[in-house]
Amino acid sequence: MKKPITTAFFLFLTTFLFSQSPAKYWIQFSFKDLDAYSIDNPEAFLSPAAIEKRKHFGIPITEQDFPVSTKLIEIITNLDSTAVLLTTSKWLNGATFYSEHPDFITLIKKNGALINYIEQTYTCSDPELFTQTNTLFFNAETPQVNIPNDLDYGFGTQQIRINNVHWLHRLGYKGEGVSLQLNDGGFQNADQIRHFQQHFEDNRVRGVRNIVQPEKSTFQDGNHGTGVWSCIAAYLPGELVGSAPACNFYLVQTEDNRTEYVIEEDNWVVALEFADSLGVDIVTSSLGYTTFDDTTYYRGYNSLDGKTSRASLAADIAVSKGMIVVNSAGNSGNKKWHYIGCPAEATHILAVGAIDSIGNKAPFSSFGPTYDGRVKPDGAAVGWQTYVGRENDKTVRGNGTSYSAPMFAGMVACLRQAFPNKTSIEIIDAVRKSGANYAVPDSALGYGITDFLKAYNLLLETDNKNLSFNFNTFVITGKNEISFTVKTKEDTEVTIHYLLREDGEVASKDFNLKAGENEISLPVAELSEKRKYDVIDLKISDGKTEYLYVLGKE
């Protein structure tokens, strides 16, 4: 069923490592080779896509963008003939090495001037034969989009409608042109099942990488990512349609399904930097870390400060580089440990809690706040009895913030398409302010169920506001009237123009506003029997500034 990607290129690099006492280690270096690179010549160390994103958003290029020093890496490999470089992180100035040396940490610490920190992050229980045939590929064909604005979501109708993202779809924002990367534990059979067939045919699966076992295809095993991806990308009209079916996708395996070690956080960091190199707009993952197979490692509540976990640190750096990062809040809400995990507690990450399709909090959805008192979760979407696509080609129900997070990420992708010039922080801020509990956040769902039509309107608002507006709802249901309040500091004359798009006839009305709050009511025509819904464009002018809003009517 999968369309072959004939333009993909494959990298084949095979090394054979016969392990005696193998382990993997994270080393954070104490300095970078500042003579090797120059901020004035970013082409030497940043991809064209990364440079373009920085130019677009006015993001400065800094020494943080410089690669890890090759000289330092060579020193490590020269100290230990069994040492093999696995991955690097330029943002955190560190690297992961494989070694068979029986006392690798002591060996490296003897050269302490080179490093700030070293720890063992993975232990192999038995000697292993590593055959690293890299299955990384990229699709060079031009992506196409053949998806209408008016969608039949099938079983997934309510899980889409509860966040009002269907209104963004109706406005034409389904994620087209937005690149979204998923970091997960494998996407078994995703290249074969019906839910994603359209994406392969339209060349919107742009790249795939397995960081954990580079020799294995991400489609080979590990079914968690398959269900996660379907929440965003499923396109089976009448059966299941995801929250952003028109996105371009990168699929990256960071999770080792065999074990739970700290190295998975480092894999996650590598995946973020990979996304940066590709110019990715949004990264989502349904992963979290508090406990590990090595019980000497433990993320206690005091670790939920955004400054402890390497993954959490990297998440905030990614946002500073122009990306938006979304993560599941976690599924510990009904357990002794009921808090969110890392990296969901990162300052600028959007941590997503779970609800059912009528708005009840899922009992398993993890609680905030962070250790330093910040509100979490940042929003909520359906993750309880969620309809998802599975590796056996069936559409079934599943539970977990693993599903609410990608559902949410797809909705954010629709906003990103609608506002390509807004910064990541501006979009994150609008999303948080659009939560039902924003005025009175709690520890259960944080800012609450997010209204993405409200977020859209918040991003429409001008910065130079003489007037402030309060809409109880941006969707008019069962009545023919628009109602909202306008607050002004002084008496002001305004003109309001509004229209139903299907009718195309503009109505106008003048108001003399008094200082303080003013109630506004505008009549709108009934929908014809042929129309299930319509969009209302609202333009308010005070003679100095125009204020634009978009409402839905059904």
Annotate the PLM regions.
Residues 73-159, 166-169:
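Autoinhibitory propeptides
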Residues 166-209, 214-264, 278-281, 294, ...:
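Subtilisin-like serine protease catalytic core
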Residues 192-203, 354-402:
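Catalytic-core environment of secreted peptidases
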Residues 509, 544-554:
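Edge beta-strands of extracellular beta-sandwich domains
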Residues 20-80, 95, 102-106, 114-129:
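Primarily auto-inhibitory N-terminal propeptides
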Residues 229, 252-256, 281, 339, ...:
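Hydrolase catalytic cores
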Residues 157, 280-284, 417-491, 496-502, ...:
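C-terminal subdomain of the subtilisin-like protease fold in secreted/lumenal serine endopeptidases
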Residues 235, 251-345, 371-374, 391-405:
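Substrate-binding/access-modulating region of protease and related hydrolase catalytic domains
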